[in-house]
Amino acid sequence: MRIIPLGGLEQIGMNITAFEYEDSIVVVDCGLAFPEDDMLGIDLVIPDVTYLKDNASKVKGFVITHGHEDHIGALPYVLKEINLPIYTTKLTMGIIENKLKEHNLLRTTKRKVVRHGQSINLGKFRIEFIKATHSIQDASALAIYSPAGVVIHTGDFKVDYTPVFGDAIDLQRFAEIGKKGVLALMSDSTNAERRGFTQSEKTVGITSVSYTHLRAHET
């Protein structure tokens, strides 16, 4: 198996990674980045997908982990270069569809909604969607199965036992897959060097509402 990062490493944003095994390529996420201060006149930064265009016959589709711009924002631009089906969860698909409408791509783009716990087959790959928790709902981690072994792609995540909506992250499923053996783990590492634990989104929400109420009262 070849793992080909096309963006998102050692930077914030523009997350996109290709997984290749023989005649099959699947692409996880397709995000954009925002320009640095010295990038004058540039509004958005999108990934270089030359490799995907050069191997278009192998590419089976985009698999999207969640609906933040740094994971989906480049889709309308990339789809104009190489039209591929999109696989993701319901809420994430809804966000993507709004973008596709803006770019007149909705009718020409194949889409499939996938539930957590469900798997899809794309060429030589089988991809399982695993429930994750993040600051946006319906986030997924992925178990990417191939004849070479299984790769776990966490997507963006936090271990949140009290999310605002829905179930907590499915740590049991990670453990079950881990017992069988994993070829590689690709993990979100944002703030990994900071001490302590990430707050639950429920706590973040209460803190934000309390602060807003206090500011309004002071005014």
State where each predicted segment sits.
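His/Asp/Glu-rich metal-coordinating catalytic cores
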Residues: 1-63, 68-215
